[in-house]
Design a protein with these regions (language model features):
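Conserved phosphate-binding elements of NTP-dependent enzyme cores
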Residues: 1-949
């Protein structure tokens, strides 16, 4: 076999990981290789679980035994042989950073360079008055003064008092004793021999005249003595006045970073001063998070038309004897009644209720004990509701009670000290190019590129910052190249979509400039508009041209056509996949009749465009005056009874419009939720729908216990079946025996999770397979019970498709399983951990759960890119489900980039024209045909190509 090995290809023989069927494959090295196929066909098993896993394992084995003991061992993939592997780097789309301290700037390391730039070339300003502060040694001060024109008349002043109340007699007396004869007091030149009496109730400024000099080549020694004397007298600060064209001009010099007016010192400019993750630079109030849990008045008083006795103060139960007695005393002292609606209280009364009246206004009340045995009498100052709630919060029993108080009565809001800017005032007072570091981070990537292109620095600053600026510009360009020019660097990492997070990591890899590496990417085009797709492809080909092998799992048509080598796995999903259906250039794959990908590229398979568009039921929801984030007073109409898509380039405002404004306002009004709502003017037409459901990509659970079976509600019915078997009845096993959430039938070593959680403190928790049950979750006695020859673990390990056949005779189970299969999830396991599901898979599980419910025909379904991770054939299947929902009278509103889906819509709302501050406008609306005729719409241009095919 030795002759099959060479440096030009990666050789795979006998790959059997997961559903792969003994695959043999040769992949060319240093090429752009795209792996395609239906969802669940085995693409990720080949790319990540075989190629990447083996690359990682070999790298680990190359380390010393000492290093390996900290990393643990990695299992060898189920494969006979892999040769020609390079060091592997995986860039997946589902590992979004949830750390609230992580931002786009920190994870791309651009913020580190910003910190360095501000520390080396920043201009400090007083955080109070805004005056620029410069630190200058004595020699530099003297050189600056001597550089003024010869013959200039100057005065050297020592500002011994700056804006302080008092008579300052001692200061004046000391100046006289030191031999000084003049001082400028409150701007007026005064002889120290005069009788000087200052008003002690007013603020004064006293500047001692140390010397008067006419500049010339022979005065340097005298000037130096005078400057040093003035600096010593005024604690490192001097004022020098000079005559310029009959005007007196003042120049301030400081030996330290201190404001001459306010006396506020600024610490030495170091990179750590600009880090919100370092106590030296972080805002002391919010510790650098930029936000805090604050008491929410709307939650404390949800209905201000009510009185205390009617329950206006949600934090206090009016039926509590203690609360009633105390507030009766508060009302008497405040001059109102407990039957007075809160909104009718005067400003004075309201202020007393909220903030108290100080130590002088005490309240007196008697608390009768519930037992009836005696009473307690109190006479104390009323601190106000806020202080009282803070005390009760601090005294809460344990974290659970504190969390309950936070959820019910508090909201996350911008820190009132730093206003969400995370840093201490001294750091925010430092500018480069007129902007402080936070203002710079608030610019989009494209705006930042423009800022640094026009940045003007002094000659010395340019030399110091040259290398830093080079790195910053390069990294910003990489972000732009992967289609993320609309992002701001202050954007929290936890708010990024999976696709955005992946493209950020891709940009970071470009910046590392590695060669000879095998990059493996998972659908980098997710969330990307067709307009930006070419830039992403250019990035992938750039990585390839640097001498790397780039392997991409992808469904995007343009990427598939660009591939040097295309591998199509299939032909179906799950047990029906796992084979190499076709491999070669895209043109070669198109000739393979069995390849659905090839037939799609060839145009043989396609989604038929509807011959007519639904007009809807004549009703509509109108949302107007939306100004949240970058939206520019946008107003939209959503025709009910239609399938409507919101389109636009990345960052144009789609998610803001749908997820931050429309969904929360509808949910709050219809479903009685209390989500924060973005800025808008008004909404109408809500009465035309009775339910709004947001089917998003958040996980269906956050622990290994959560799985599709429990989420859609079939696991209860399956446990009933097992409990009804003769074996279970003979042993007295009830339904609970087959639950991994309660004691009895579960494995107690892992408590039914199948894994043991190892807490890593500062790192994410690690899950390892339980060594007692081997990951089966249940104990041996429970696993001995079988239904149709399968135990409960066997059933949980079935794919949805296998389970559909297994439970075909049980309608209430098979109906729910069929909905999972209908949304393209036939390949996932019934008991598959929620932690292993991608965002797109989790979204489709939720969609299946909704499909299984009885439709009212007046529901608005909201979805954000449900085609994520879907092959063309899966998209076709999903669209049939979506159209079925609309046929039942419901409305579907969807954010989408997939052109096949967009062309299926009845109505489009296109936002743009660009992302970030250049977006936020409605560019086009109407049917796909109408939008395709709008030249300003990027979406319309691509739709036109699709419609013209």
């Amino acid at each position: 076999m030795a002759n099959i090995f060479n440096n030009e290809k990666i050789v795979i023989r006998g790959a059997r990981e997961h559903n792969l069927k003994n695959i043999d494959l040769d992949i060319p090295r240093n090429k752009l290789v795209v792996i395609s196929g239906l969802s669940g066909s085995g693409k990720s098993s080949l790319a990540f679980d075989t190629l990447f896993a083996e690359g990682q394992r070999r790298y680990m084995e190359s380390l010393s035994s000492y290093a390996r003991q900290f990393l643990g061992s990695m299992d060898k993939p189920d494969v006979d042989l892999i040769e020609g592997l390079s060091p592997a780097i995986s860039i997946e789309q589902k590992s979004t950073n949830k750390n609230p301290r992580s931002t786009v700037g920190t994870i791309t390391e651009i913020y580190d360079y910003y910190r360095l730039l501000y520390a080396r070339a920043g201009h400090a300003h007083c955080p109070k008055c805004g005056r620029e502060i410069k630190e200058q040694p004595v020699d530099q001060i003297i050189d600056s003064i001597m550089s003024w024109p010869e013959g200039t008349k100057i005065q050297v002043l020592a500002p011994v008092i700056r804006g302080k109340k008092g008579e300052h007699a001692k200061i004046i007396e000391d100046a006289q004793k030191s031999g000084f004869i003049r001082a400028r007091i409150d701007g007026v030149m005064t002889s120290l021999d005069d009788s000087i009496k200052l008003d002690k109730q007013k603020k004064h400024t006293i500047e001692i005249v140390v010397d008067r000099i006419v500049l010339g080549p022979d005065v340097r020694k005298r000037l130096a003595d005078s400057v040093e004397t003035a600096l010593q007298s005024a604690n490192g600060i001097i004022v020098v006045t000079k005559r310029v064209e009959d005007k007196e001009v003042e120049v301030f010099f400081s030996q330290k970073n201190a404001c001459p007016d306010c006396g506020i010192s600024v610490p030495e400019l170091q990179p750590r001063l600009f880090s919100f993750n370092n106590p030296f630079g972080a805002c002391p109030e919010c510790t650098g998070l930029g936000q805090k849990m604050e008491w929410d008045v709307k939650k404390i008083i949800p209905d201000s038309s009510k009185s205390f006795n009617e329950g206006a103060l949600a934090f206090y139960n009016p039926e509590s004897e203690w609360n009633h007695s105390m507030f009766q005393a508060v009302a008497e002292e405040g001059g109102f009644s407990l039957d007075t609606p809160v909104e009718n209280l005067s400003k004075e009364q309201s202020d007393f209720l909220w903030n108290g009246g100080g130590e002088n206004r005490k309240i007196h009340w008697i608390y009768k004990k519930q037992s009836g045995e005696g009473y307690s009498e109190y006479n104390r100052a009323w601190p106000g509701i806020i202080s009282d709630m803070k005390r009760r919060y601090a005294d809460a029993w344990g974290d659970a009670q504190r969390v309950r108080i936070e959820e019910k009565f508090m909201s996350v809001s911008h820190c009132s000290s730093c206003h969400g800017q995370r840093l201490r005032p001294e750091a925010l007072g430092v500018t480069v190019g007129g902007k402080n570091i936070w203002e710079l981070c608030c610019l989009s990537v494209s705006e930042s590129i423009d800022f640094f292109s026009g940045l003007e620095l002094s000659e010395s600053e340019s030399k110091i910052a040259a290398q830093v600026l080079k790195e910053i510009r390069a990294r910003l360009k990489f972000l732009k190249d992967v289609g993320l020019d609309y992002l701001t660097l202050e954007r929290a990492a936890e708010t990024l979509s999976g696709g955005e997070a992946q493209r950020i990591r891709l940009a970071t890899q470009i910046g590392s400039a590695l060669t000879g590496v095998m990059y493996i990417l998972d659908e980098p085009s997710i969330g990307l508009h067709q307009r930006d797709n070419q830039r992403l492809i250019d990035t992938l080909t750039y990585l390839r041209d640097q001498g790397n092998t780039v392997i991409v799992v992808e469904h995007d048509e343009q990427t598939l056509r660009t591939a040097d080598f295309l591998v199509d796995i299939g032909p179906g999903a799950g047990i029906h996949g796992g084979r190499v259906v076709a491999a070669g250039t895209p043109e070669e794959v198109m000739k393979v009749a069995e390849s659905k990908t090839g037939q799609y590229l060839a145009g043989t398979l396609r989604m038929e465009i509807p011959s007519e568009r639904r007009k809807g039921n004549g009703q509509k929801i109108v949302l107007s005056g939306v100004t949240e984030h970058n939206l520019k007073n946008v107003s939209i109409e959503i025709p009910l009874g239609t399938f409507t898509c919101i389109t636009g380039v990345s960052g144009s405002g789609k998610s803001t419009l749908m997820s931050d404004v429309l969904y929360p306002v509808l949910s709050n009004k219809i479903m009685r939720t209390s989500y924060p709502v973005g800025a808008y003017k008004e909404i109408s037409g809500i009465e035309n729908i009775d339910k709004v459901i947001n089917i998003d990509q958040s996980p269906i659970g956050r622990t290994p216990r959560s799985n599709p079976a429990t989420y859609v509600g079939v696991f209860d019915a399956i446990r009933d079946l097992f409990a009804a078997t003769p074996e279970a009845k003979a042993n007295g096993y009830q339904k609970g025996r087959f639950s991994f959430n309660v004691k009895g039938g579960r494995c107690e070593n892992c408590q039914g999770s199948g894994t043991i959680t190892i807490e890593m403190n500062f790192l994410p928790d690690v899950f390892i397979t339980c060594d007692v049950c081997g990951g089966k979750r249940f104990n041996k006695e429970t696993l001995d019970v079988t239904y149709k020859g399968k135990n409960i673990n066997d059933v949980l390990n079935m794919t949805i498709e296998e389970a559909c056949g297994f439970f075909v005779s049980i309608p209430h189970i098979s109906r729910k399983l069929e909905t999972l299969r209908s949304v393209g999830l036939g390949y996932i396991q019934l008991g598959q951990s929620a932690l292993t599901l991608s965002g797109g898979e989790a979204q489709r599980v939720k969609l299946a759960n909704e499909l299984a419910r009885v439709s009212t025909g007046k529901t608005l379904y909201i979805m954000d890119e449900p085609t994520t991770g879907l092959h063309f054939a899966d998209v076709k299947q999903l669209m049939a489900v979506i159209q079925r929902l609309v046929e039942q009278g419901n409305t579907v509103l969807m954010i989408e980039h997939n052109l096949d889906v967009i062309c299926q819509a009845d109505y489009l709302i296109d936002l743009g024209p660009e992302g970030g501050f250049r977006g936020g406008n409605i560019i086009a609306k109407g049917t796909p045909e109408e939008v395709s005729s709008v030249k300003e719409s990027y979406t319309g241009q691509f739709i036109k190509e699709m419609l013209d095919r």
